Amino acid sequence: MALVQRQHSYLLRYFRLMASRPRPRLFSHSLYPSLHRHSSALSSSTPRIKFQLANVFSQRLVQRNAVSPKSFMSSTMESLQESSTSKDYSSEHIQVLEGLDPVRKRPGMYIGSTGSRGLHHLVYEILDNAIDEAQAGFASKIDVVLHSDDSVSISDNGRGIPTDLHPATGKSSLETVLTVLHAGGKFGGKSSGYSVSGGLHGVGLSVVNALSEALEVIVRRDGMEFQQKYSRGKPVTTLTCHVLPPESRGTQGTCIRFWPDKEVFTTAIQFDHNTIAGRIRELAFLNPKVTISLKKEDDDPERDVYSEYFYAGGLTEYVSWLNTDKKPLHDVLGFRKEINGSTVDVSLQWCSDAYSDTMLGYANSIRTIDGGTHIEGVKASLTRTLNSLAKKLKVIKEKDISLSGEHVREGLTCIVSVKVPNPEFEGQTKTRLGNPEVRKIVDQSVQEYLTEYLELHPDVLESIISKSLNAYKAALAAKRARELVRSKSVLKSSSLPGKLADCSSTDPAESEIFIVEGDSAGGSAKQGRDRRFQAILPLRGKILNIERKDEAAMYKNEEIQNLILGLGLGVKGEDFNKENLRYHKIIILTDADVDGAHIRTLLLTFFFRYQRALFDAGCIYVGVPPLFKVERGKQAHYCYDDAALKKITASFPGNASYNIQRFKGLGEMMPAQLWETTMNPDTRILKQLVVDDAAETNMVFSSLMGARVDVRKELIKSAATRMNLENLDI
């Protein structure tokens, strides 16, 4: 997209932004002759498009469709009116959902959402099943293919799903796990097929089946190949089998191919290669004995992309990879320990040029994005053990100094992976581990390892404590500014920034704030907004790059203070509470030039480092102003990219006379134009950002916004070959 390439697209590698716009769907035949699509109902001409804010690097911040307040209120009132028409309430109104109907009725309960994240969750469910086979020692190779018809196939060389008759259902075991909720081999106990697995509820495969237009499965085991096809959770063919040829009789495993259902998902059915590659890379680090391949097919076979992931070093190599662009204080520390049937695997490293921590937790190879008892165990052990060792070995001389968890974790990259026979996850999407015994096991293991290692390597302890003491001193220097932020109530207008043009609504859920670049754009935005629910905060130039500054410098910066106070962000490090925000929509609105792209990136860096939970809560948005205005007679057309401009001009007669205006700054637009094209909830394009892969996003911010010029230069050089020089705004 031309808009992107004019805005230093290398600064926004991991921002994938999508919005519905027309474009034709592309389909092609499968490379697997045994997996054909027979039903014409599986194809669709539904117009969809994917907008990308950057196409230079793999993306890690993903967009979700935004619903305008007016649209929300309209649909809500319609629902209320419909429900109020029936005053009777009897047994006729009680619905009994059977089979996989609950999944199709409430898909969000099983996959988190019906947007992009839920779409990719389907892939992860099948991929995690293959990983469970690998963790059990039965699979060593997993292949993932993103087909050009928007389907996905995942195959492994594990044992293969059983196909014999199941005594409880009277169906084959294969059909049972595909069509019956809570049917699987991972419930633990003597009858379980796995000692350790990421599956708990026996719903993963059946959920994918329920939410797919079509699903095809091939199982190879016992010298036979079994095949069956499904549509929206129901079998459309019987289970067929044939004897494998002699040269293939030793092969075994499972291959699942599915086409997500367009009736279920609210976004375009389009899998992001980089998102899935990030998850596969993660799994390869966590399972060092497994090779995972990823292939992205194209209509033109010469443009197919193939990658293979294998990391013999495991978590130690993972930490090194994450810290590639940083200055480590010591070699990567790590250990693996088994206690009472559970396995604890931890790797960690401190870096001198990092001012925040990166802590990633996994349970049975499932990424627990909301942490859990394993992360709590590491944090508690680190704080207690480092304080104890520092005082014991007299690295800390003052008796009164006690380093907090924030101090000892500054600059830390830590990965903890646990394998637990009976994991207790919160919800089907498994975002948090709840086993209380895991905290004790992890805490004890980390303490024993660090105590032994650091007593033998006092120089490493000294470097870590020195880094922690610097964090402690910086925290003291920032205390006055922090207390100022804490003492100023976000509800008092007297404490708000002077340039903030607030909205009249006091309900954060319906309020939104536009962070705009400069007084010129701020003036147009203030005049063009809807004062009832839209606030405007103009910035004075570029804000501080907090990636290169400590906490003290950050709190002293006036523009940063304005953001913290104006938005109600609270104090860094404190638990995030969305209800404390003054606005639940924070919209970044900058000019379509290099400076605008830079300011947007600085703001994203600030939000990611200061309060990362803003992305998880769905509060961060990017506004999209038009690039062009095309006037022909009394008609005016606004175009948001070069493709739209070409489409409009191509629709005019050859001898037509028209004028094209290129907008580079928001200040060039009249208030009415800005409202209609960029701020009106009914007509604007608003793109929501969420963190899809925290580890890679963290690494990119470190590379692009950190102090190391050589790393940034190398990153830019590696992207140069993929940029269209004609679209650069020089």
UniProtKB/Swiss-Prot annotation:
Localization per record: Plastid, Chloroplast
Domain Toprim: 511-618
One Pfam family it belongs to: Toprim
Binding site for Mg(2+) 2: D591, D593
Cofactor binding, note field: Binds two Mg(2+) per subunit. The magnesium ions form salt bridges with both the protein and the DNA. Can also accept other divalent metal cations, such as Mn(2+) or Ca(2+).
InterPro entries: DNA_gyrase_B_C, GyrB, HATPase_C_sf, Ribosomal_Su5_D2-typ_SF, Ribsml_uS5_D2-typ_fold_subgr, Topo_IIA, Topo_IIA-like_dom_sf, Topo_IIA_B
Any one of the GO BP annotations: DNA topological change
The protein's enzyme class: isomerase
Residues with site note (Interaction with DNA): K542, N545
One Gene Ontology MF term: DNA binding
TM helices/strands, residue ranges: none
Role this protein plays: A type II topoisomerase that negatively supercoils closed circular double-stranded DNA in an ATP-dependent manner.
Family: Belongs to the type II topoisomerase GyrB family.
Assembly with partners or alone: Made up of two chains. The A chain is responsible for DNA breakage and rejoining; the B chain catalyzes ATP hydrolysis.
Official protein name in the record: DNA gyrase subunit B, chloroplastic
